[in-house]
């Protein structure tokens, strides 16, 4: 489960707790729901806590500076750095190539490595994707589904105009 805009360890703990059943968390219990085959999986609640993957998005300068504390929260399985909101948080909206934005991304990755936690990032640019892989990001999302669909539709439309 991906949690957006987590800035500190308190918010990270809240995210984790919302995915865990009592007594480890506050997730609501529904005995006859699809996730446990409508009540037929007898040990579902015992297994569920261990099978959830919690990834928090660090999308501000404050979050980048707090990554070590966020990563230390038990149950946080990964960090995803969000360049769009990160650039906006420092008054440079949409300026992903800006030196300060890239410096914060590098700091975030460095803090993830020091904390031994997987780090991910999103970019629409191939050269940045290659750079992020080379830098050591665990996973790199290249572009978005909506952008890919829109560009494909534009190219198809050009073909028939």
Question: Each PLM stretch: what is its role?
Answer:
Residues 1-3, 54-59, 71, 79-81, ...:
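Hydrophobic faces of well-ordered beta-strands that scaffold small-molecule active sites
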Residues 2-15, 79-90, 137-156:
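Glycine-rich phosphate-binding active-site loops on the catalytic face of alpha/beta enzymes
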Residues 3-74, 88:
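Conserved anion-binding
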Residues 9, 98-106, 126, 150:
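Non-membrane alpha-helical structural segments and their capping/turn regions in soluble enzymes
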Residues 17-25, 47-49, 97-120, 160:
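Alpha-helix-loop-beta-strand connector modules within alpha/beta enzyme cores
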Residues 19-21, 73-78, 134-140:
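Glycine-enriched alpha-helix->loop->beta-strand junction motifs that scaffold or abut catalytic
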